[in-house]
Amino acid sequence: MDEILEEELEKKESEEFEERIVEIRRTAKVTKGGKTLSFRVLAVVGNRKGKVGVGVGKAREVPEAIRKAIAAARASVVEIPLYKTTIPHEVFGRQDASKVLLRPAAPGTGIIAGSTVRAVVELAGVQNVLTKCLGSTASVNLALATLNGLKDLVSPEKAAKLRDITPAQVLYGARKEA
């Protein structure tokens, strides 16, 4: 009975998250006996409703590396606040030498981003955003920088409570009262 419930839970979890392989890279370790080949995979999982995760997997075979990357991505899933179809405010994500600027955009703008950042943002559920990558463009670091930036997002309600103003003032700027 417990096995059936566990299987159903696993099916629901796998159906809930969409998986995307961003990069498969062949790496080589040079040894006395020659080169030892292995593969590194960067995967992103998300439900397009505010949950997203990034993972890296390494193995001698591609399918095993993919499995490990997806497992790592599922383990790193974080929830982010969304405001309509965009992010609530501008945010800057960093990972090592990679930096990513994420800006909210008007409806109809779409996702203005490179392939790595686009994968993370799309699977998070953001439909309109402007991004700019600064520094290193290594795909793993860009994906992690984007995730770090998304982690730093604060919902308008929470920001308003912290700053003791209304959520509208957070989103549209403070207006002078006559």
Curated annotation (Swiss-Prot):
Pfam families: Ribosomal_S5, Ribosomal_S5_C. It comes from the Bacteria. Residues 17-80 form the S5 DRBM domain. Keywords: Ribonucleoprotein, Ribosomal protein, RNA-binding, rRNA-binding. One of its GO terms (biological process) is translation. InterPro entries: Ribosomal_Su5_D2-typ_SF, Ribosomal_uS5, Ribosomal_uS5_bac-type, Ribosomal_uS5_C, Ribosomal_uS5_N, Ribosomal_uS5_N_CS, Ribsml_uS5_D2-typ_fold_subgr. With S4 and S12 plays an important role in translational accuracy. Part of the 30S ribosomal subunit. Contacts proteins S4 and S8. The N-terminal domain interacts with the head of the 30S subunit; the C-terminal domain interacts with the body and contacts protein S4. The interaction surface between S4 and S5 is involved in control of translational fidelity. Belongs to the universal ribosomal protein uS5 family. This is Small ribosomal subunit protein uS5. The lineage of its organism: Bacteria, Thermotogati, Thermotogota, Thermotogae, Thermotogales.
